[in-house]
């Protein structure tokens, strides 16, 4: 429930602090005093649109905050907990608007996006505006009212989810089909491009090995000649060779070491060098023996190497990248080849998803039909109480499978007959302004009782109503206030007198500036205000007596 409202520098309000209570609170005031200004300010806390013109003239910013008790609001508490914003049993929404139109939103002191403020606001307060009777003529509003009364949140969520899944898959299938012809042309091009690569069948690391072999074969003569020269220098030279010389050095060092111990380490060092030279000699000898210049092999390697280089140039890649390029083209072809198979599988999936949507929409439809009959009776009864004794009301729910939406297949129409003998027709065709106001109020009061929102606001919803009908409206709202908090802006004394509490809005001018104030009235002040509403500026004993009767009758 709304416990406190703080308004600073909003429109013509300098500063306003309101403590609010359970039950029904009525708000009255003179014409032009700004009876709805507190509701407008509260709307900012609930995520309403912000404008620079809302900032009081001469001030830098507007700041509005609303404190709510969460004792009986499990949905709001759960939402706050899920979003890591829960702080005890109270929730404070705050909004700041600067004179240049910038806006900041806060929940329990933490900055939040406006979307979160709106979402939480819907769990805290339900606002019924003075133009609701105009909305009542719109089919989408009529459908919303029925769903709200029936508590279709879960069914609507399931239907919307099924619809979105079906439409997403349908759009994917449509895109695949549109691309099919283009894919065929692309497939033919890829198959032409890949033909030579398939014939080449290059291995993953083959080019590196091929390049090394080609270089080796191309230089085989020089390799053999230089190998032979190195072998001769190492060990096979007739006049001199490295191993022979090093062996002579080794013998000499051994003799020297025997003569002087300081040279003991030198023979072993030369011995190690001898071992390495001998190993080098044997490696070269084996390598020379392996050199076998095969003209056929050389021709094969040259031809294959040339093909790799040619295809690499043709495909605009480096030779060492040709294998990966080939694999990428194969993958593209595989993807295009399976497009028909993919389309077939996706078409089957679309059918399944559509049937899921149809099942969810049908379940929602049946529930709407059931609750429409229930709501028919309640609204007709309420209209009779609101001085429309002969009126008949009916909600028509028609299912049209050709027109699907996230809300299912249903079209809802509110039908009414205001006089005996008249057929039921859409309310926009037959109802007058006053009748629309009464029907709208009846629907709002009935649906409000079904919504799990602890605070309800009725902003001049009694427009077009007077006399005994106004008294009935007041009693309906008071009864509603016994189970939930109701704030009602009204100009009717019969409605104002039914409130458990009453606030008075006054406008005054100070130092050339207009200010709006809101006062909580005691019993005597309420009688005086009700008398003013009954008789205008001239308050008489008769109007005072009537005002007292209104309070007693409530």
From Swiss-Prot:
- For this entry, the protein name equals DNA repair protein RecN
The GO molecular function terms of this record are: ATP binding; ATP hydrolysis activity
Entry GO CC: bacterial nucleoid
Which organism is this entry from? Vibrio cholerae serotype O1 (strain ATCC 39315 / El Tor Inaba N16961)
Q: Does the keyword Transmembrane helix apply?
A: no
Pfam (any one)? AAA_23
For the ligand (ATP), the binding residues are 29-36
Q: Which CDD domains match?
A: ABC_RecN
- Gene Ontology biological process terms from the UniProt entry: DNA recombination; double-strand break repair; SOS response
């Amino acid at each position: 429930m709304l416990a406190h409202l703080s308004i600073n520098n909003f429109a013509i309000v300098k500063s306003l602090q309101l403590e609010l209570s359970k039950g029904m609170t009525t708000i009255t005031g003179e014409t032009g005093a700004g009876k709805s200004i507190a509701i407008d300010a509260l709307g900012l806390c609930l995520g309403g649109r912000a404008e620079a013109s809302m900032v009081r003239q001469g001030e830098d910013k507007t700041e509005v905050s609303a404190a709510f008790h969460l004792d009986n609001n499990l949905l709001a508490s759960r939402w706050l907990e899920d979003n890591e914003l829960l702080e005890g049993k109270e929730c404070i929404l705050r909004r700041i608007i600067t004179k240049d139109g910038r806006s900041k939103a806060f929940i329990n002191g933490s900055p939040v996006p406006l979307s979160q403020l709106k979402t939480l606001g819907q769990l805290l307060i339900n606002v019924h505006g003075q133009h609701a009777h105009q909305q009542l003529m719109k089919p989408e509003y009529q459908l919303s009212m029925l769903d709200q009364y029936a508590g279709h949140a879960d069914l609507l969520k399931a239907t919307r989810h099924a619809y979105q899944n079906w439409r997403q898959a349908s759009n994917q299938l449509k895109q695949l089909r549109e691309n099919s012809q283009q894919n065929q042309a692309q497939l033919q091009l890829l198959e032409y491009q890949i033909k030579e690569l398939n014939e080449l069948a290059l291995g993953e690391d083959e080019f590196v090995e091929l390049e090394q072999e080609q270089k080796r074969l191309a230089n085989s003569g020089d390799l053999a000649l230089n190998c032979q020269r190195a072998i001769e220098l190492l060990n096979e030279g007739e006049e001199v060779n490295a191993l022979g010389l090093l062996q002579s050095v080794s013998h000499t060092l051994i003799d020297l070491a025997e003569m002087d111990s300081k040279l003991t380490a030198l023979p072993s060092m030369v011995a190690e060098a001898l071992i390495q030279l001998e190993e080098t000699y044997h490696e070269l000898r084996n390598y020379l023996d392996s050199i076998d210049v095969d003209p056929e092999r050389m021709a094969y390697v040259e031809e294959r190497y040339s093909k790799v280089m040619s295809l690499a140039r043709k495909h605009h890649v480096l030779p060492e990248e040709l294998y990966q390029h080939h694999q990428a083209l194969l993958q593209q072809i595989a993807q295009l080849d399976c497009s028909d198979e993919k389309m077939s599988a996706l078409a089957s999936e679309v059918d399944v998803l559509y049937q899921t949507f149809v099942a969810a929409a049908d379940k929602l439809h049946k529930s709407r039909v059931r609750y429409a009959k229930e709501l028919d009776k309640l609204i007709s009864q309420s209209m009779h109480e609101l001085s429309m004794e002969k009126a008949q009301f009916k909600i028509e729910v028609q299912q049209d499978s050709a027109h699907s939406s996230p809300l299912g297949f249903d079209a809802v129409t509110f039908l009414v007959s205001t006089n005996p003998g008249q057929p039921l027709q859409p309310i926009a065709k037959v109802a007058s302004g006053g009748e629309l106001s009464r029907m709208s109020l009846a629907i709002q009061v009935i649906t409000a009782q079904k919504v799990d929102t602890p605070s309800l606001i009725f902003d001049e919803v009694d427009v077009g109503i007077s006399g005994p009908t106004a008294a009935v409206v007041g009693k309906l709202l008071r009864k509603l206030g016994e189970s939930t908090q109701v704030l009602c802006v009204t100009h009717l004394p019969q409605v104002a007198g039914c409130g458990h509490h009453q606030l008075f809005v006054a406008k005054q001018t100070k130092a050339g500036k207009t200010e709006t104030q809101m006062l909580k009235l005691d019993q005597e002040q309420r009688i005086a205000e009700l008398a003013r509403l009954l008789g205008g500026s001239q308050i008489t004993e008769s109007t005072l007596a009537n005002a007292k009767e209104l309070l007693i009758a409530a």
